[in-house]
Every structure is written in structure tokens, then in C-alpha cells.
């Protein structure tokens, strides 16, 4: 089973580049399932029904999110009703949407879990480690289970990877928009990367126009951030997963230009 996980898609330019790039890459690599973090896929921050549909129409099967999930109120009803878009499972139960979904491929099923870190991000959220424990007790949980861990701190992400090792198929980190070079199969068979990266404009600061970020750093005043344009990239990781064991055989990291 070939499962592709794509880094945070940034704005309309990221969405458009994904639409141009993903279909051919799926065919070339024989990819079965695509998971993408879409929490920044709308211009102006957050995710909207339109940007989510753009990603799904482009070949993404499941969209995960993060700390920007609730930025756009028009998205609340959409995520409540969708089985293809999830938000961090350790959000309060009153939050719209759900934190886990199951994709039925006919011959097999795949569970996708979304969690968010506490360190430097939101210390008031429920513990992602304990939330994982609860979710893994779900009756009839599929053998293949992928986790998007949306978190800031490398240490928290790596600790979570080892905590989940042998219990889920793969853990891919999101949020920082910077692809790390530590993709691996952990000792008990879980595929892992600290951060898969970003899908969006290359000449930018995490997708934002560089001059705006520089202005904020120098002036220490509020600055409205706009996404950059120009050439884009698609950062992703491919997990080769054994359908019998649910564990990862190999990982391969890409940055498509």
C-alpha cells in the first residue's frame, strides 16, 4: 500500500500547484491514498469549503488540519458534515468536525488520525499522547492507521513518534512548513518524519511574502501577512505499508518543483 502524505498546502498558489503536479506523480509512483494538510489552503489564512473541494478534486483523499482550522466560520458546517476532512482529535468535543476518519478502499480500510501538539502551540489542549491511546481503543479500528501530528516542537514530535511506534502505521509531522531530513522507519515498524514540509511558494517565509515578515520583525508592529506568489514546490513523503501487518516497509521523501 502506497500512501502519500503532503505538507501544509498554502493558499491558492499551493492548491493550483498541487492540482498540476499530483495526478502525474500518483500515476508514476502507483499511489493508493493521498493525505494532505489543508489548514492554510485558503488565501487569507485558514481553510474554506472552496479550498477543501479544490484539494479533493485534485486527487487528495483525506484533508487534515491544525491550529487554523476554525479561522473561517463558513467552514464549520462543512467539516461537521464531511468524512474527508478532519481536525485535531484533541480539540474540545464542542469543536466542529471530528479527529479521526476511516477511508474504505473496498479491499481494505485506512484510519487517519489528526492530533495537535501542546509545546509552544496550545498547552491547554488535551494531551495528544493520551488522546491517541483513547482513539486506538476504537472498536474494529483498521490495521492501517496514519497520524498527522500538527506540532511546533521537534522534541515533542519525535517523542510522539516513539510513543506511537508499533501502534500505528506512520506518523508525519506538519505545521512548521520546513521539511526535515529525518524520515525513517522506527524500531517497531512505524514510518516517521518530523515535518513533511509545505506546498506553496518557494521564495517566501513559510509561504508568506518575505518583505512582510521582515517588516514585522524590524518594526515589532502588527503586519497583515499575504501569501507570496511565484514558483512553487510540493513537499511530501511516501510510505510503503504492508497491508498484512499495517507497518511501514520503507519511506521516501520528495520536494517536487
Regions of interest found by a model, annotated:
Residues 1-257:
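Acidic, metal/ion-coordinating pockets
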Amino acid at each position: 500500500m502506497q500512501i502519500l502524505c503532503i505538507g501544509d498546502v498554502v493558499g491558492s498558489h499551493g492548491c493550483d500547484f498541487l492540482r498540476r503536479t499530483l495526478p502525474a506523480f500518483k500515476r508514476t509512483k502507483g499511489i493508493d491514498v493521498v493525505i494532505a494538510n489543508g489548514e492554510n489552503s485558503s488565501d487569507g489564512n485558514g481553510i474554506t469549503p472552496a479550498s477543501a473541494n479544490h484539494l479533493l478534486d485534485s486527487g487528495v483523499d483525506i484533508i487534515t488540519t491544525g491550529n487554523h482550522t476554525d479561522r473561517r466560520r463558513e467552514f464549520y458546517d462543512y467539516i461537521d458534515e464531511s468524512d474527508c476532512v478532519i481536525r485535531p482529535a484533541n480539540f474540545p468535543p464542542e469543536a466542529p468536525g471530528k479527529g479521526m476518519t476511516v477511508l474504505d478502499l473496498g479491499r481494505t480500510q485506512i484510519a487517519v488520525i489528526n492530533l495537535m501538539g501542546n509545546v509552544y502551540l496550545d498547552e491547554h489542549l488535551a494531551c495528544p499522547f493520551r488522546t491517541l491511546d483513547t482513539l486506538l481503543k476504537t472498536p474494529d479500528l483498521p490495521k492501517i492507521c496514519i497520524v498527522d501530528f500538527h506540532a511546533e516542537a521537534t522534541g515533542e514530535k519525535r517523542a510522539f513518534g516513539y510513543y506511537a511506534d508499533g501502534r500505528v502505521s506512520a506518523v508525519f509531522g506538519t505545521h512548521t512548513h520546513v521539511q526535515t531530513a529525518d524520515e525513517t522507519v522506527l524500531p517497531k515498524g512505524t514510518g516517521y518524519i518530523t515535518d513533511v514540509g509545505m506546498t506553496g511558494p518557494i521564495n517566501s517565509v513559510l509561504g508568506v511574502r518575505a518583505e512582510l515578515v521582515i517588516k514585522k520583525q524590524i518594526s515589532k508592529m502588527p503586519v497583515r501577512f499575504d501569501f507570496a506568489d511565484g514558483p512553487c514546490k510540493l513537499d511530501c513523503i511516501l510510505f510503503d505499508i504492508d497491508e498484512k501487518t499495517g507497518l511501514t516497509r520503507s519511506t521516501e521523501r520528495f520536494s517536487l518543483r
